[in-house]
Amino acid sequence: IITGAVSAAQNIVKCITRCGLEVEDMVLEQIASSYAVLDEDEKELGVCLVDIGGGTTDIAVFTDGAIRHTAVLPIAGDQVTNDIAVALRTPTQAAEELKKKYGSALVQLAPEGEMIDTPSVGERAPRKLARTTLADVIEPRVEELFLLVQAELRRSGFEELLGTGIVLTGGSAKLTGMVDLAEEIFHMPVRLGVPKYVGALSDVVRNSSFSTAIGLLMFGHRHQSNHYPKRRFGVSPPSAIFGRMKQWFSRHLGEESQ
């Protein structure tokens, strides 16, 4: 049984409907991501999927080929960014860019002696800070996150059943040192999960940031049903799809500019 806020689900459906589309199904984020990044052997032997996004970290445990436990933690990439902004006294957008470009979840992996330009708040001049200083801010928050995941696994009773270990995915999982720090904390194999996609633009799509989106496509393809109206899904001409997109942007962005 999976529970969630009805109003949140309804808001998502309304957004899709306003774009001229219909919603076939609602899929739990962890299940969608699992379609993109997990192997059937992993699900059978036992694996924990940790999807680290911006606002939340979503956990799913699979054993014997089925999902056994899910949880959502309120700590993720946005909290890391906020820590950087506060500790280094830099704007939030700059903190996000510093995290993505120079961040490391392990201080020991940050190049010693390398300095980075750090914007200041307001009209103050930018400063130069060591990359190790940035890592000093990031590591404690990521460690806290992994310890919370570990506590959730122990509470669920599935920690000892993860035969293939942990799979990290999501946009925030790409941070340098995430896998190394996770292995230190969980004491089991850890890998970065990227979508198993080999089609056009695979060099772009094979990115952990797109795990949920690609997983939704794979879920929909695998669970196609003849009772859904074909004209709306899969066979709509590109001109119709882009036409609806153009109308949506014209309507909503046009209103904002007025």
Language model features: what each stretch is:
Residues 146, 150-164:
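Phosphate/pyrophosphate-binding loops at sites that engage ATP/ADP/AMP, CoA/4′-phosphopantetheine
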Residues 52-60, 183-195:
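Acidic-glycine-rich active-site phosphate/pyrophosphate-binding loop
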Residues 26, 69-71, 189-194:
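Short hydrophobic/aromatic-enriched beta-strand-loop microsegments
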Residues 4-5, 103-106, 161-185:
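Glycine-rich phosphate-binding loops at beta-strand->alpha-helix junctions
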Residues 38-69, 84, 216:
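Gly/Thr-rich phosphate-binding beta-strand-loop-beta motif of the actin/hexokinase/Hsp70
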Residues 67-79:
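Short glycine-rich, Thr/Ser-proximal phosphate-binding strand/loop in the N-terminal lobe
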Residues 1-49, 77, 88-135, 156-159, ...:
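Nucleotide/phosphate-binding catalytic cleft detector across ATP-hydrolyzing
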Residues 82, 132, 136, 140-147, ...:
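Feature representing long, continuous alpha-helical segments
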